[in-house]
Structures are given as C-alpha cells and as structure tokens.
C-alpha cells in the first residue's frame, strides 16, 4: 500500500514509471525493523520497536516463521512508559517462550518508586512467560548462548532471538550473530 502511494505521488510529480520501478525494486525496507540474520542455526531479529503493541505484533509475526522457540530480549525504555503501559507489557510477550530483560534506560527521567526492570519482569512472569533479568548488558550474549543449545534441541525448528530496543541492543545482536556464525 505504501509503495502504491509512493508510485502515485511520483507519477503526479512527473517522475517516470521506469524510475519509480527502479527505485521500488532497490528498496529493501527500513533498517532495524524486523531485520533478520540467520547465524549458526539461529534466526536473530533486530527490531527498533519498544511499544508493547508493536512488540506483540512482531512476536506474532515471528511465530509464523518457525515453530522453534522464541527468546525476546528487551531493554525497557523510560519509567513513565513502563509505568503507564506496564499491563500491556505484561501480555506483550505472550508469543515468546522466554524473555531476557536488562536494566531500564531512563532517558533522564526521575525514577517512579517501585517501577523498575525487576518490577516489569514480575509483571511478565505473572502472565506465564519465563523471564530472566540480566542487569549487565555485557552478560546478555553469554546468557543467550547458554539458552540456545537447550532450546534448539527441543525442536527441529529454527530458534529465534528477537532484540527489541535501540543501538546498544543491536550491538549485542551483532555480537551474538558473530559468535553464532563462528560456532
């Protein structure tokens, strides 16, 4: 639908159909929105989304790609967002087999008493999804590697690790890809 609107707009501005066709053919999508890399028998996905509705949709889409286990990795963003959308986050991970959460990115906000990453972990866990709280970002890739042999042995389908967040989590995803690729 977006391509149709872009093409129509281009034509109305006098851009040739051939130029539009070439442009659309070369478009590979938005970087870090469901960016998929297969490495070492694991599908690693990077997605910039941090709103629970979008995360729920990404996980539902990932579930259609493989019957293998899904591990979601999330760095919560802002006290206010986690506080006001806590109930939505609690159910957003229902299609994940496991969630790994690290410390909250505060974006300079004043803390809200009782609202923190362990609180969010409890909310998700209370909705039936296993959660691991890994406060140190440097420990996440090793933790994921320790999970993957057991989850990949559990089924014949490709396990998926989905990183939700921003640049620091994407660097972790790249580190996991590098380590899996050499495994």
Located regions from the model:
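Thr-Gly-centered strand-to-loop micro-motif
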Residues: 45-46, 108, 134, 163-164
């Amino acid at each position: 639908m977006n391509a149709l609107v872009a093409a129509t707009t281009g034509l109305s501005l006098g851009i040739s159909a051939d130029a539009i066709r070439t442009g659309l053919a070369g478009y590979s999508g938005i970087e870090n929105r469901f960016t998929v890399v297969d490495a070492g028998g694991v599908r690693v996905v990077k997605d910039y989304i941090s709103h629970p509705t979008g995360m729920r949709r990404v996980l539902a889409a990932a579930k259609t790609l493989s019957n293998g286990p899904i591990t979601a990795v999330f760095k919560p963003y802002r006290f206010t967002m986690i506080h006001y959308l806590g109930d939505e986050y609690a159910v957003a991970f229902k299609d994940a087999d496991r969630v790994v959460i690290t410390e909250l990115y505060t974006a300079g906000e004043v803390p809200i008493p009782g609202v923190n990453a362990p609180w969010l972990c409890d909310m998700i866990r209370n909705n039936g999804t296993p959660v691991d709280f890994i406060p140190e970002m440097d420990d996440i890739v090793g933790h994921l590697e320790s999970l993957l042999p057991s989850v990949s042995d559990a089924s014949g389908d490709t396990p998926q690790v989905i990183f939700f967040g921003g640049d620091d989590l994407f660097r972790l995803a790249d580190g996991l890809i590098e380590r899996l690729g050499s495994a």
